[in-house]
Amino acid sequence: MAPDTCCCSATALRRRLPVLAWVPDYSLQWLRLDFIAGLSVGLTVIPQALAYAEVAGLPPQYGLYSAFMGCFVYFFLGTSRDVTLGPTAIMSLLVSFYTFREPAYAVLLAFLSGCIQLAMGLLHLGFLLDFISCPVIKGFTSAASITIGFGQIKNLLGLQKIPRQFFLQVYHTFLHIGETRVGDAVLGLASMLLLLVLKCMREHMPPPHPEMPLAVKFSRGLVWTVTTARNALVVSSAALIAYAFEVTGSHPFVLTGKIAEGLPPVRIPPFSVTRDNKTISFSEMVQDMGAGLAVVPLMGLLESIAVAKSFASQNNYRIDANQELLAIGLTNVLGSLVSSYPVTGSFGRTAVNAQTGVCTPAGGLVTGALVLLSLNYLTSLFSYIPKSALAAVIITAVTPLFDVKIFRSLWRVQRLDLLPLCVTFLLSFWEIQYGILAGSLVSLLILLHSVARPKTQVSEGQIFVLQPASGLYFPAIDALREAITNRALEASPPRSAVLECTHISSVDYTVIVGLGELLEDFQKKGVALAFVGLQVPVLRTLLAADLKGFRYFTTLEEAEKFLQQEPGTEPNSIHEDAVPEQRSSLLKSPSGP
């Protein structure tokens, strides 16, 4: 085998298995930092996983089932050292909406979402995510933060029999507010206050420096440990308090209850399910999930790619977006074999990972191992965790998702983008897919309007000059013809015109036909239309079209000088052999400009 072939094969293998790129350089220093980061993330993900299972409407163990597979898959396939895959608030909300509190539906949704994500990665379809704009994403996540947060008020206050639909939830929560359990309310609010205080301490902790006294370094390390593991600390403390009351025969808190012990069995996803003595087939399950088969994989990819790009930019490295699609897709497919529901990249846990100095995705191995150990040995203790404490964890986790700044920023910068933001935000309270679909449609209409009606710069005078400020595509050709016709041909008398094409990088057949008809209109009026600033690919295309009366000039001055010739002078059409020498040489270059 030729050396070049071996080199290409090795490069391709490293691209598909990024672990091969950094493992040869792995060091003991990296191992120490990765271990600390993995442990920190593990202490964060365990209480969050239990809490997010509640958001998803599933038994608590399903949160833990969903929390470890991504750690191992991303070790091999991930291109970001910071990202951690697992259950998130947004994904849990979507799962709740599309799986009807049925674990079988949730696991099948993970499998099908993973297949779709894998296909997108293999076919390099990641660019499709670019059509969901930032205002749409912000509108959805802001609405989701309110939906998720308010949905936990019932657990925070110990209320029972509250519906899950948002508007009914709001109504019944206020209707039954008098049934608040004092124990749950006190514990929940105290847990939330403690979490907020610890988070504030973490954010305002002074950076370390070599000249710190040993006692100060130790104190800082202790505070850093407590604030980083604040979720685990608060949930563990609440569980101890609840256990103390339980052994005395008092029951002031609503507890999580019995959790299935042990590791999840490895089995294929359920392609049918029996409910109320009726077997629901695979096709019926797919039909029941409906739009979720598009919304869940797309939102999972968006959330994960957004997290990866954010931390890659912050920490000065690059990610491979299509490789990230493969990583998250395979995570969901393999996760479905161990009863996981759909997962994605977690911003909060990724931030913990980055702040603790993680060096490689190997930190995920520690996190995954910690989750497996907790499943195997600690599930009996998790049953004493009060639901109000988990509600406090969720509410403090989703509060930052509500982005007030985006509303102010768009008002100052681009008010039109407030339209898709508000449409998505408001409709997401009604139906999630309607919010995302309507917001994306509004964004697309705004984009199409700018394509169909590009802004132009106009210079009036004896010769009319028009310059499109952006590209020229087929939806815009009629508007362009109308603008030139109204200003030049319908003037009294008709006057010649120049089309300045500096910003036009390509033209399609419809544009060529429209320009040909425009040239004929100018000839009928006895005036001329000249083209200036054509890029080489566009010039090639127009010359190949052999448009009658086509004239091209290098500069605007040349065009104006030509068009201002004495009446009766017949100008010569410019063909490829008459193009200025510099341009002609470019035309002959197969590589373009």
Swiss-Prot record:
Membrane-spanning residues: 35-55, 57-77, 83-100, 107-127, 177-197, 234-254, 288-308, 325-345, 362-382, 384-404, 418-438
Record membrane topology: Multi-pass membrane protein
Known catalytic reactions: hydrogencarbonate(in) + chloride(out) = hydrogencarbonate(out) + chloride(in); sulfate(in) + H(+)(in) = sulfate(out) + H(+)(out); oxalate(in) + chloride(out) = oxalate(out) + chloride(in)
GO MF entry, a single one: monoatomic anion transmembrane transporter activity
This protein's UniProt keywords: Anion exchange, Cell membrane, Ion transport, Lysosome, Membrane, Transmembrane, Transmembrane helix, Transport
UniProt keyword Transmembrane helix, yes or no: yes
Annotated STAS domain residues: 453-566
Listed Pfam families: STAS, Sulfate_transp
Tissue specificity annotation: Abundantly expressed in the cerebellum, with a predominant expression in Purkinje cells (at protein level).
Coiled-coil region list: none
Polar residues: bias regions: 582-593
Any one of the GO BP annotations: oxalate transport
Location of the protein in the cell: Cell membrane; Lysosome membrane; Apical cell membrane; Basolateral cell membrane
Cytoplasmic side: 56, 101-106, 198-233, 309-324, 383, 439-593
Stored InterPro entries: S04_transporter_CS (IPR018045), SLC26A/SulP_dom (IPR011547), SLC26A/SulP_fam (IPR001902), STAS_dom (IPR002645), STAS_dom_sf (IPR036513)
Disordered: annotated span: 564-593
Paired cysteines (S-S): none
PROSITE patterns in the record: SLC26A, STAS
GO CC annotation: apical plasma membrane; basolateral plasma membrane; endoplasmic reticulum; Golgi apparatus; lysosomal membrane; membrane; nucleoplasm; plasma membrane
Chain ranges on the Extracellular side, renumbered to this chain: 1-34, 78-82, 128-176, 255-287, 346-361, 405-417
Disruption of the gene: reported phenotype: Conditional knockout from Purkinje cells (PCs) induces a negative shift in the reversal potential of chloride as reflected in the GABAA-receptor evoked currents, indicating a decrease in intracellular chloride concentration. Both in vitro and in vivo, PCs show a significantly increased action potential firing frequency of simple spikes. At the behavioral level, mice show deficits in locomotor activity.
Membership in a protein family: Belongs to the SLC26A/SulP transporter (TC 2.A.53) family.
Function: Sodium-independent anion exchanger mediating bicarbonate, chloride, sulfate and oxalate transport. Exhibits sodium-independent sulfate anion transporter activity that may cooperate with SLC26A2 to mediate DIDS-sensitive sulfate uptake into high endothelial venules endothelial cells (HEVEC). In the kidney, mediates chloride-bicarbonate exchange, facilitating V-ATPase-mediated acid secretion. May function as a chloride channel, playing an important role in moderating chloride homeostasis and neuronal activity in the cerebellum.
Name of the protein: Sodium-independent sulfate anion transporter
Organism of derivation: Mus musculus (Mouse)
Record lineage: Eukaryota, Metazoa, Chordata, Craniata, Vertebrata
